[in-house]
Amino acid sequence: MFHGIKKSDVKELTEEEKAKNELQLKKLKAIQDQILKIRDKNTYEQKSMEFLLKSSVLMPDYPTLWTIRKILIEQHLPNLKDEEAMEFLIKEIKSILPIMMKNPKSYLLWYHRIWCLVKCIEIEIKKGTELEKSVLIGEIGLCNKFFLKDDRNFHCWNYRVKILSLISIYFQSTFQKFVKEELEFTIEKVTVNFSNFSAWLYRSKLIPIYFVQHNIKWNTKEALDFFKDDLELIKKAIYTDPKDQSPWNYLSWIITNFSPMYIKSINLDENNLLIIKYSNVFKIESLLEIFGEEKNYKLLNKEEFSSEIKIQLNNSENWGEEKIIIQNKNIDKVKIGFDGLSLVTNKICFTKENLSLPTITISKSKEGKLIYNIEMNNVKDFQLEFLQKQLDEINELIKLSPDFFIENGHVHLAELYKIFYQIRRRNADLKEKAEEDKKNEIAQLKLLQEKSKRMNNMYSTILKIEETDN
């Protein structure tokens, strides 16, 4: 299975086919030997370049071939004037297109194309000029042609993300319009094919950029309204084929972004290392302001973003006199960058207007027992309404098609149950309802558990939530 799509069965080769493969293998071995000779000679020659290009038709996924070709190109470029170098690279890009059309899922071919394109940009930067916009837009058009053959080609989708990154840097004035058009394009693709995992994923990369451009804050009513059509489309996709994991994954992404942050676990080991695990990633750097001067504890986190806090507690008989109070002081931070050939990077740090980081008061008694109190703030009515609606719709799907759901949707239901239970347990006005709902939810899980062993993990996960509270 790959993104919910079954792979074709591999049939056994006949003796004639095996013999043919042996001959082909000998031919490829001879070509490989010649390629290694070119590598050892390490000198740019036109005949060597022609041989490598011809060989790539038979060996498109041979890494050494493309590495040598890049080395020779880099040797040759300094000998050319800027205009000549640009012409050389454009010719190189065009020369590999027929090979790409025959091998549309070759990592190395797509990488070589973007490598050449970046070289073109480097020349333009050196000249103090800009690459023509039509070149990058033309690459988007190329992707569209490949999608006509296979709209799920994730190599092509990854390439499109890289082109998006280049456009964001070099054509900022039109980038906002381009993002809007790309969002419309993703809707077209997933509407035609609900199983288009890459289209859903690409959409999830575009939306954070769109929100920044239009000053839309996550976890607000305005942000949720943006997803109105998306949620209807997801519902249609899931009801069409509950086994398809693509819309499920996109739904999980939306739910995560509109769910209050909660604490998954708090553990203190024998070495006095305290680890607090949260349900979402947040910015560690902002915690330094909260901890301030070190007293009986030390914050160990070194990374910029994490979903857990690591604190080393010092041995002290009077530790119970000290308290660690962790509260939300994060600020929004979105990075849209291009570093070499990396993809567009979107890192969103959650705020109290965004996701609620629970306030924790932690202390340690003289007997060494860990004592803590958790309070979840800033849970909004529209959040609860949204999550409740998703829960109701999934429960409705269980009634209509329990067998399909058990095999595909149980993880998402478990996540929703966990979120709801944590919200209710942390809010005084919802605590009473929490116990009643938990009984109903566990009853639902037991019913599903009888139908499939795969429900065991889900059932035990829900029951273990109470360990966080005690």
Where are these regions (language model features)?
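A conserved position within tetratricopeptide repeats
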Residues: 2, 39-42, 52-60, 73, ...
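Residue-level recognition of tetratricopeptide repeat
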Residues: 48, 62, 105-106, 152-153, ...
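Structured C-terminal portions of repeat-based eukaryotic scaffold domains
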Residues: 208-470
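Eukaryote-skewed repeat-based solenoidal scaffolds used as protein-protein interaction platforms
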Residues: 93-103, 110-241
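Boundary/linker elements of alpha-helical solenoid repeat scaffolds
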Residues: 28-36, 73-80, 121-128, 164-172, ...
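Extreme N-terminal leader/anchor segments
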Residues: 1-64, 71-81, 85-90
